[in-house]
Amino acid sequence: MDDKKNAPSSDKSKALAAALAQIEKQFGKGSVMRMEDGAVVEEVQVVSTGSLGLDLALGVGGLPRGRVVEIYGPESSGKTTLTLQTIAEMQKLGGTCAFIDAEHALDVTYAQKLGINLSELLISQPDTGEQALEICDALVRSGGVDLIVIDSVAALTPRAEIEGDMGDSLPGLQARLMSQALRKLTGSINRTNTLVIFINQIRMKIGVMFGNPETTTGGNALKFYASVRLDIRRTGSIKSGDEVIGNETKVKVVKNKIAPPFKEAHFEILYGEGTSREGEILDLGSDAKIVEKSGAWYSYNGERIGQGKDNARNYLKERPELAREIENKVRASLGVPELGAIKSDEPVAKKASAKESKEAKELKEVE
């Protein structure tokens, strides 16, 4: 009886092995693999956003490489600042970055203040949406670019709209453009381990009585293809006396395919400086009991580092090694890995398995 039961199973194994042999012959080795062989499942490589609180809210310590990310929010909420900081962090790891400026509004002086090496940054100011997405596709396929930012989806104007008259009605043209581009881009992005960030704007749906009337531009394709979607909002102002020197900012992770979603991060964006990273380290460090706070004094390892948040922040700014040490302890306490250097990014499909797979043995038997 047992032999009869095992016979169909053996036939199925041989049929599967033959099918796998045909697939590998037609599409190349690694087209289909078992998950347990370790050739597919890998630790997600990430790059910091420049905000410790947001890195922690993302669950893996930053934005994932080899994925599409969407950052959206109202005007002057910090979208471009966040992406420029991410570029600066990627450059610190030795990565190559590109900025596709469809809005033709990049402030290079501000980018430099945020720590970006302009001589190493690739920049494009395309004339049409098709041109912008073709440039993005070419850069991704090259495998030589680690991070691409497109600013913004709303500015990706289809060629037909530019060449037409002002009053022409062209419904759904931009949505179709985005849908086609993302279908083409997604596979290449994953193979080359490139992080692609789309900045998007908010529009209001007309006639919505119940629910959220807000929506993003460019149709629904980006919502589906994005592994991470961040909703960034300005919640208040930071003042020094009567002068406004920055914004209080809230970011909600509204979609996350690599960690639990719906977490929030609160941080400060200072004008001309970007995210107050030292301020975040103090706040999150005191929450994790790594930095001691007694009255107005902040202390670390029994040594006082400043009276009042401003003094403590300046102390850490002058001592980046100490700030990094505290940040790594905060990350470790919450189970988020430290950010390391970029590894060699050979396409996943071509990486050899550590052990010979079961399919390989079966294929030998078939042959």
From Swiss-Prot:
MF terms (GO), sorted A to Z: ATP binding; ATP hydrolysis activity; ATP-dependent DNA damage sensor activity; damaged DNA binding; single-stranded DNA binding
Ranges where the record places region Disordered: 345-367
Annotated residues for binding of ATP: G73, P74, E75, S76, S77, G78, K79, T80
GO biological process: DNA recombination; DNA repair; SOS response
Domain of life according to the entry: Bacteria
Keywords: ATP-binding, Cytoplasm, DNA damage, DNA recombination, DNA repair, DNA-binding, Nucleotide-binding, SOS response
Matches recorded under SMART domains: AAA (SM00382)
Gene Ontology CC terms, in alphabetical order: cytosol
Cell location: Cytoplasm
Keyword 4Fe-4S (UniProt): no
Database matches in Pfam families: RecA, RecA_C
Record-linked PANTHER family: MITOCHONDRIAL DNA REPAIR PROTEIN RECA HOMOLOG-RELATED, RECA
HAMAP family linked: RecA (MF_00268)
Main function: Can catalyze the hydrolysis of ATP in the presence of single-stranded DNA, the ATP-dependent uptake of single-stranded DNA by duplex DNA, and the ATP-dependent hybridization of homologous single-stranded DNAs. It interacts with LexA causing its activation and leading to its autocatalytic cleavage.
Name by which UniProt lists this protein: Protein RecA
Phylogenetic classification of the source organism: Bacteria, Pseudomonadati, Pseudomonadota, Betaproteobacteria, Burkholderiales
Gene symbol of the encoding locus: recA
